[in-house]
Amino acid sequence: SRLDINEEFDLIFVSNVIHHVKSTERNDLFKKIHNLLTFDGHLLIYEHNPYNPITLKLVANCAFDADAELIKKKDLIKICNLNNLKLKKSGYIHFFPSKLKFFFNIEKYFKWFFLGAQYFCIFKKNTKT
């Protein structure tokens, strides 16, 4: 998790990457991300949900995910909070396969339900220490 960048960003978007970062290196990663955000910058994270059995099966059978260490949403929130990133919004997403796309319009009502294939978290940089 090497981030040698000398710029600041209003938004950092991390899509299905955290599970490839070793759990022992995640704290340093989020410390660096915090430092890369502008004063009122936001971090948007999109990750696999380890509570979804289909996601677990797909990750287990994917060679690209051989090193994957899935992270629960609550653990992601905790490590971000420890690094002064305040949760603004979160939810679970992708409940139905494409064959059931006629259900896609109601997925927004299930954000609270922990069995979505993925989840998202939106954090804001907390400058108060």
Question: Residue locations for each model-derived region?
Answer:
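Class I (Rossmann-like) S-adenosyl-L-methionine-dependent methyltransferase catalytic domain
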Residues: 1-4, 21-25, 44-129
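Local beta-strand N-terminus motif with an aromatic residue
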Residues: 8-10
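A conserved beta-strand element that flanks and buttresses the S-adenosyl-L-methionine
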Residues: 13
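A short glycine-rich, Lys/Arg-flanked "PGG" loop and its adjoining helix->strand segment in the class I
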Residues: 27-42
